[in-house]
Regions:
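Autoinhibitory propeptides
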Residues: 70-145
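Disulfide-rich extracellular modules in secreted proteins and receptors
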Residues: 21, 26-27, 80, 92-98, ...
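Fold-level signature of zinc-dependent metallopeptidase catalytic domains
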Residues: 2-12, 16-56, 129-289, 302-309, ...
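Short, hydrophobic/proline-enriched secondary-structure or compact coil segments at domain edges
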Residues: 103-111, 255-264, 429
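Conserved phosphoacceptor histidine of two-component systems
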Residues: 313
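Catalytic-domain carbohydrate-binding cleft regions of carbohydrate-active enzymes
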Residues: 316
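Long, contiguous regulatory modules within eukaryotic nuclear regulatory proteins
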Residues: 31-96, 415-416
C-alpha cells in the first residue's frame, strides 16, 4: 500500500535580509561557554543567537560504491557537528568556523535566504571574511557527534527512529564533498525533527545514523516530453513506483528502522510515455521497522532544502499516518477517536501548500501515537548508540534569495524571478514567474524567510510570525 505526497513544500524560513547578493562581514560578538549560546553579527537586521544541535550519530557511516564494491567510511559525527549551530527564533541553521582571524559562515538565514563565503580572492588578508547573502525559490503547485545516552534513548516520552538516507549520484554531485552532503542532510533532519515536536506520548524524533551514495545503475529512469517547460523536447524523469519497489528490495530489511532514498531527478508517473510529475515522494504506509517495507523516497533540489517538508510527510506515512480525511490504517483503527477533514491544510493533507502545512493535525498525532504503541521492543530500542548532529545555527531561509530559489527550482525557465512579494510573503509562499508565455509556480516559503515589514517576522512551519528560532534551542 503506497502513501503518495503529490506536492512539494519548501521548508526553509527566511530571515529579513535586505538585498539579494548583499556582501556582509559576519563576526562573533559573544560566546557564553563551550557549547552555550554564541552571538553572531551578520548585519544590523541579522543577529543570530546560536546554540549547538544534535542529529548525527557519534560513529557516522558514509557508504559509496567504488568499482562495484561497497566501501564504508566511518566519519566522526562529533567532528562534523562541531561547527553546526542553530537559532530557533530566526529559524536559522549554519556552519560556523573560525578562520584566519575571521569567521566563515555557511547555511540558512531563514525561509529564503542563504549565506556563503565569497571566493578567497575577494579577501585581502586576515580579519573579517566577506560573505554573500543570496535568495532561493521553490517549485509549482498542481555537523559533530553526540553519544546516545539518556538524551537519545527511547522511553515512554520519546521514541527515536534510526534513519538511513541513500542519495543518488545526481544529488551527491551537487556537493563539493561527502562531509558537505552529510551536513546538508543533518540540517534538513534537524528541521524535520522540529516539526515532529508536535507529537506527544511519545514524542517522535529521528536519528540520522548512515548516509549512503547509491550505485549508478540503482535508479529507474525514463525519458518523456518536459511537461513543465514545453520549449524543451525531452527530460529525464524517475518512476516512483519502480523506484520504491527497488528501494524496498535492496533496503527493506536494513538494520535502520527506516531508509529514505533521496534524488534530485524529477519524480513522475509514466503514463504511456507521458510524465505526470506531481508526485514528490512516496512511502510504504506503516513501513517503519517492518520486514521488507521500511522505505520511502523523496525528491530534492539541493541546495534549497526542498526535501524537508516532503521527508517529514513521507516519514509520517511510514509511522502509520494516512492523509487527513482518508481512512486510517486498519491495524490501528480501533485505537482512534479523532476524524479530520482533508481540507484543513495540515502537513498530512492530500495536497501541499495548506495554511497549516508546517504542523500535524490532531488526527495525525493520534495515529502516530497508536502506531508506535504497536511496535516491538527491538524497534523501540536505540541500537546504534550514536547519531549525527546538525551544526547549523540558523534557519536556511534566512539567507535564501527568493529569485535564486526560483532559479534552482525551475532552472529551464528563462529570466524566472520572484514576483508579487508583498502579497505572497505574509502567506509564506513564493510566486516564481518567467516570461509571460510560461506559467507561474507557487512555492512554499523556506523556514526562516522574512514575511513582514521591518524583517521582524519570519516564516516557520508555513506560518508568518515573530518566531523564536528553533535552532537556538538545544535538542
Amino acid at each position: 500500500m503506497f502513501a503518495v505526497f503529490r506536492c512539494t513544500f519548501f521548508s526553509w524560513l527566511l530571515l529579513g535580509v535586505g538585498v539579494c547578493g548583499n556582501v556582509v562581514y559576519p563576526r562573533l560578538l559573544e560566546a557564553r561557554g563551550l557549547d552555550a549560546e554564541k552571538v553572531l553579527y551578520i548585519q544590523d537586521d541579522v543577529v543570530l543567537r546560536l546554540q549547538k544541535t544534535s542529529v548525527l550519530s557519534e560513529s557516522f557511516v558514509f557508504s559509496e560504491n567504488i568499482n562495484g564494491r561497497r566501501v564504508d567510511k566511518i566519519m566522526n559525527g562529533k567532528e562534523i557537528e562541531a561547527d553546526m549551530y542553530y537559532d530557533r527564533n530566526r529559524m536559522a541553521s549554519v556552519n560556523l568556523k573560525a578562520k584566519n582571524g575571521g569567521v566563515e559562515v555557511k547555511g540558512i538565514l531563514g525561509h529564503r535566504l542563504r549565506i556563503a563565503p565569497l571566493d578567497i580572492s575577494a579577501r585581502t588578508g586576515d580579519g573579517p571574511i566577506p560573505h554573500e547573502i543570496f535568495q532561493v525559490e521553490q517549485r509549482a503547485v498542481i555537523p559533530g557527534n553526540h553519544s546516545v545516552g539518556q538524551e537519545a534513548k527511547s522511553d515512554d516520552n520519546i521514541f527515536y527512529a534510526e534513519l538511513k538516507i541513500v542519495a543518488d549520484g545526481n544529488h551527491r554531485d551537487a556537493f563539493k564533498s561527502d562531509q558537505e552532503l552529510v551536513e546538508y542532510l543533518a540540517l534538513s533532519m534537524k528541521l524535520v525533527n522540529i516539526r515532529y515536536e508536535d507529537t506527544s506520548n511519545p514524542r517522535v524524533q529521528f536519528l540520522l545514523t548512515t548516509v549512503e551514495v547509491a550505485e549508478n545503475n540503482f535508479t529507474e529512469l525514463f525519458y518523456a516530453p518536459d511537461v513543465d517547460c514545453p520549449g524543451r523536447a525531452v527530460k529525464i524523469y524517475m518512476d516512483p513506483v519502480l523506484m520504491i519497489n527497488k528501494t524496498a528490495k535492496i533496503y527493506g530489511n536494513s538494520d535502520e528502522d527506516i531508509t529514505v532514498f533521496v534524488t534530485s531527478v524529477d519524480l513522475a508517473d509514466n503514463f504511456d510515455g507521458t510524465a505526470y510529475n506531481h508526485v514528490m515522494g512516496q512511502a510504504k504506509l506503516g513501513g517503519l521497522c517492518s520486514k521488507g517495507r521500511r522505505v520511502a523516497i523523496v525528491e530534492d533540489v539541493p541546495p534549497t532544502y526542498s526535501l524537508i517538508q516532503i521527508i517529514a510527510h513521507e516519514l509520517a506515512h511510514t509511522l502509520g499516518v494516512s492523509h487527513d480525511g482518508d481512512e486510517p490504517l486498519q491495524s490501528i483503527a480501533q485505537k482512534l477517536n479523532s476524524r479530520c477533514t482533508g481540507f484543513s491544510g495540515h502537513l498530512m493533507a492530500p495536497s501541499a501548500h495548506g495554511k497549516n502545512n508546517g504542523h500535524f493535525s490532531n488526527c495525525s498525532i493520534e495515529q502516530m501515537r497508536a502506531f508506535v504503541s504497536t511496535l516491538n521492543e527491538s524497534c523501540r530500542e536505540v541500537k546504534l548508540k550514536t547519531y549525527h548532529k546538525a551544526r547549523a545555527q540558523e534557519l536556511p531561509g534566512k539567507i535564501l534569495n527568493r529569485t535564486y530559489y526560483c532559479q534552482k527550482k525551475h532552472p529551464n525557465y528563462p529570466r524566472i524571478t520572484s514576483e508579487h512579494e508583498d502579497y505572497y510573503k505574509p502567506l509564506c509562499k513564493v510566486l516564481c514567474c518567467a516570461d509571460s508565455i510560461y506559467p507561474c509556480f507557487e512555492e512554499p516559503a523556506v523556514d526562516g524567510m522574512p514575511c513582514g515589514h521591518g524583517h521582524e517576522k519570519i516564516c516557520f512551519r508555513h506560518r508568518c510570525d515573530k518566531h523564536v528560532d528553533p535552532l537556538k534551542r538545544s535538542q
